[in-house]
Amino acid sequence: LLPALAKAKAKAQRINCVNNLKQLGISFRIFATDNQDRFPMAVTTNEGGVADVIADARGLGDPTMMYMIFGALSNELSTPKTVVCPSDSLRTTPKNFYELVTLRDRSGGKNAAISYFVNFTADETMPQVILAGDRNLTNSQFNPGNETAYSKMVKLDPRLLDRGRGADLGFTSSMHQNSGNVVLSDGSVQQVSGQRVREQIVNSGQEHQLLFPYYRRNMN
C-alpha cells in the first residue's frame, strides 16, 4: 500500500508541476503581448523587465538575480506558488512576490523560492525553444544537487550537442525520478528525459542560455 501511495503522490506532484509550467508559459506570453512581443529577459528595468539586471549589452550583469524574472511576471502570475515545484523539497513558497524578491535566500526568498530554470535567450518568435523547466537538469559542468555557488548562466550550443557533446545531460532523481518537465516558448509543456532536452535544443537550432536558481545553502 505504501509504495502505491508514494507513486500516486509523485504522479500528482508531477501533474501539478506541469500545470505550474503551463501557467508560466501563459504568463510569459501575456507579458510579451503587452511589451512588443518581448519576454522580461529582453525588456529593460525601466520598461518593467530584467534585461539590464541579468546581462546587459556589454555582457555585464548578475545572473544570480534570475529570480527577478518572476518578479517581473508578478502581475501575470496569480501566486508565487506557481514557481515552486511540489516535488522540490529544497525550495519554499513565500507569502507574496514582494517577499520573493526581498527576503534573503536563507529566509526563503529570491532563488530559494524558485524551482525552475529560465532560458535567457527564449523569444516568442522561436516557438520550439525551451523557455523554462525543472531546475534539476544537470551534466558534468553544473549540478543542482550541490549548490556550493550562486546562480550562473549555462550556455548550450545546438551545434555542439549535435556532435555528441552533452551526452551526459539529464535530470537528477531529486524531483521527478530522473526526468523533468519543460515549457517551450509557444506555451506547450513536455515531460522529458535529458536526451529529449538535448534533441529539443538541437532541433530548435538556437543557443540556449539557461539561468538556474542556485544559492549557497552551505553558507554560515
Regions picked out by a protein language model, each given a short descriptive name:
Residues 15-220:
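Short, well-structured segments within or immediately adjacent to enzyme catalytic domains
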Residues 1-19:
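Amphipathic alpha-helical segments typified by the pilin-like N-terminal helix
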